[in-house]
From Swiss-Prot:
Reaction equations catalysed: D-ribose 5-phosphate + ATP = 5-phospho-alpha-D-ribose 1-diphosphate + AMP + H(+)
Positions of Mg(2+) 1 binding: H136
Record localization: Cytoplasm
Binding residues for Mg(2+) 2: D175
Molecular function GO terms recorded: ATP binding; kinase activity; magnesium ion binding; ribose phosphate diphosphokinase activity
Cofactor annotation remark: Binds 2 Mg(2+) ions per subunit.
Function comment: Involved in the biosynthesis of the central metabolite phospho-alpha-D-ribosyl-1-pyrophosphate (PRPP) via the transfer of pyrophosphoryl group from ATP to 1-hydroxyl of ribose-5-phosphate (Rib-5-P).
A GO cellular component entry from the record: cytoplasm
Gene: prs
The protein's name in its UniProt record: Ribose-phosphate pyrophosphokinase
Assembly and interaction partners: Homohexamer.
Keywords: ATP-binding, Cytoplasm, Kinase, Magnesium, Metal-binding, Nucleotide biosynthesis, Nucleotide-binding, Transferase
Cofactor: Mg(2+)
């Protein structure tokens, strides 16, 4: 662990969503986590106390806005306000998993664009920069009028599969929206791609239709940004096997894994599901099929580069 930032104006704080990841990030940077307490009043209101001076400091807050989403967003907003009033030089919010990202447009009449609302709230509270990972909709970057560094999980996932030495692989996108992501992994692994043509009649319900591309006799690797109820990914895995794939792996950056997800994965044709620790994975969800990778080195390096005013774009590759 480097120690060059121990006595610097770089401060890293963690709220309640993912303290283990925050500790790993701080260790990579070479600092301890900042001292703060996040409590609740008897009526449930959030109470935050910053227990050290941060005047003139460049502060980075680690907080995924995962379940419970609204609790974690309020913690983040209140922390930003506290830092602003305590005269922090910059307030950089590190959101490994950006909640509400799937509400990025009006899909039906009279629907809100909640991801834009969240961006407005964060800016109004006083955030000066955002660092995030694999936004569900990349255009969310345009919802902010402050700098945003959008990191990618594909290199981490690709490197893992490269070490496995799998033969005759094909990278599969479970829907048309994920083709760009699948192509990036395919380029890194020098593999062809295939696409699942999927129809979704209502939220959290999906129906696999057709497979575009050659998967017969190949080792298929499904890649997605988020796996929520796992309906899409398990139906895709079953369709791949039915159409001749020899075995199926799956991976994602954000393992939401809500509702019946774990049961579906356990009973599916997926040989291994590779995820990152952008969201805390409870012990009951750590089944043998699930393998977790850490994004701490990636995020830690991004924080160092932002603090040192160096280019972050090198990390996108």
């Amino acid at each position: 662990m480097s120690t060059q930032y121990l006595n610097s104006n770089l401060k890293v704080f963690s709220l309640n969503s993912n303290k283990e990841l925050a500790e790993q990030i701080a260790k990579h940077i070479g600092v301890g986590l900042g001292k703060c307490s996040v409590d609740r009043f008897s009526d449930g209101e959030v109470q935050i106390n910053i227990e050290e001076s941060i005047r003139g400091c460049d502060v980075f807050i680690i907080q995924s806005t995962s379940f419970p989403v609204n609790e974690h967003i309020m913690e983040l907003l209140i922390m930003i306000d506290a830092l602003k009033r305590a005269s922090a030089k910059t307030i950089n919010i590190v959101i490994p998993y950006y909640g509400y990202a799937r509400q990025d447009r009006k899909a039906r009449s009279r629907e809100p664009i909640t991801s834009k609302l969240v961006a407005n709230l964060l800016e109004t509270a006083g955030a000066t920069r955002v660092i995030t990972l694999d936004l569900h909709a990349p255009q969310i970057q345009g919802f902010f009028d402050i700098p945003i560094d959008h990191l990618m999980g594909v290199p981490i996932l690709s490197d893992y599969f490269e070490t496995k030495g799998l033969k005759d692989i094909v990278i599969v996108s479970p829907d048309h929206g994920g083709v760009t992501r699948a192509r990036k992994m395919a380029d890194r692994l020098k593999a062809p791609i295939a696409i699942i043509d999927k129809r979704r009649p209502r939220p959290n319900v999906s129906e696999v239709m057709n497979i575009i591309g050659n998967i017969e006799g190949k080792t298929a690797i499904l890649i997605d940004d988020i796996i929520d109820t796992a309906g899409t990914i398990t139906l895709a895995a079953n369709a791949l096997v039915e159409n001749g794939a020899s075995e199926v792996y799956a991976c994602c950056t954000h393992p939401v894994l809500s509702g019946p997800a774990i049961e579906r994965i356990q009973n599916s044709n997926i040989k291994e599901l590779v995820v990152t620790n952008s969201i805390v994975l409870p012990e009951e969800k750590k089944i043998d099929k699930v393998h977790e990778l850490s994004v701490a080195p990636l995020i830690g390096e991004a924080i160092i580069r932002v603090y040192e005013e160096e280019s972050v774009s090198v990390l996108f590759n």
